[in-house]
Amino acid sequence: VEVLTQTPSPVSAAVGGTVTISCQSTKSIYBBBYLAWYQZKPGQPPKALIYTASSLASGVPSRFTGSGSGTZFTLTLSDVZCDDAATYYCGGADYTGYSFGGGTEVVVKG
């Protein structure tokens, strides 16, 4: 399974600002179809934000944008809100299995 390396935590963001989180894989993600982004808050299950690298999951606002291919992927949060404070994970698959990045905590400052 590939190793996924994310932007180190914490990342500070201002309300109304923009945050970019990177995810780098040691192997090419299989056809880019198996790269996803998740949001996790304390005491809550992870919430899927992005699938197939750039597709928004149902109910996720368009402020969240996924991009990238191969071994380099990015999650961008625009017009940051206080509710966006969370830990964000990328997850990806190659032919041997699925793995997750270490997570990037986003701290929102008003």
From Swiss-Prot:
Q: Which domain of life is it from?
A: Eukaryota
The record places the site described as At the hapten combining site at Y98
Keyword annotations from UniProtKB, A to Z: Adaptive immunity, Immunity, Immunoglobulin
Glycoprotein is among the record's keywords = no
- Framework-1: region residues: 1-23
Pfam families, from UniProt?
V-set (PF07686)
Q: Region (Complementarity-determining-2) spans which residues? A: 52-58
Q: What is this protein called?
A: Ig kappa chain V region 2717
Q: Where is this region: Framework-4?
A: 100-109
Extent of the signal sequence: none
Q: Where is this region: Framework-2?
A: 37-51
